[in-house]
Amino acid sequence: RDRLRSRGLGDVYKRQGLISGVAFAIKSLRPEVKVYGVQAAGAASMYNAFHDHKYETLEHVSTFADGIAVKTPGENTYELISKYVDDIVTVSEDEIATAILTLIEKQKLIAEGAGATPVAAALFDKLPIKGKKTVCVVSGGNIDVNILSRVITRGQVTSGRRVNLVIMLEDRPGQLLKVSEIISQCGANVVGVHHNRSDANMAITGCFLKLELETRDAAQIKEIEDKLTAAGFKLVSDQTAAQH
């Protein structure tokens, strides 16, 4: 309590479950401090209740943040949140994954999906915190290692650190070499290659080359795509390749 009173705290981000107690305590001691809630967009029961000013139950929820995968918000929780919380925002699955990856890399901290939602809100500018002293309450590190592996990959994709490219090639010698040289010149790392020339719907003289790359950021991905296009290669989506 004494620390809360003495510190120049500006904003607190919190997920739904504990926010009622946290908000009550903070507002009782420092009513000027802003308190924000964060929910997964696929399980936004309290977000809807807060903004629609009515208590409601979702038909279904869809999020890997199972700690906040709640269809019906608690009645007492809703009453306290309505009184003490300033706003509630939502974050996507990709944003949560990026937050988990950021916590691992920058803070050496393993957070579960629900615990990382406040960090996701901060990273993706969901609320006005620039220039303010802000606290994100990261509550929970209970995440399955198999899920964690997928989350890390998703976070890399979202942050431009990993990308899948599908290229339509003429099936003749030298094409793969040209593509490899362009990627090498751009400084990306190839971690996966799949060469598909056997689909019955594909032109006899053509093939699809699917590459999985490790990259620095979105700017490097664009550089690679632009150079491949300038060299005469056609980039297609995964969905397009799957249809051929």
Predicted regions span which residues?
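Single conserved hydrophobic/aromatic residue that forms the stacking wall/gate
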Residues: 1-13
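Active-site-adjacent helical/loop segments in soluble small-molecule enzymes
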Residues: 74-132
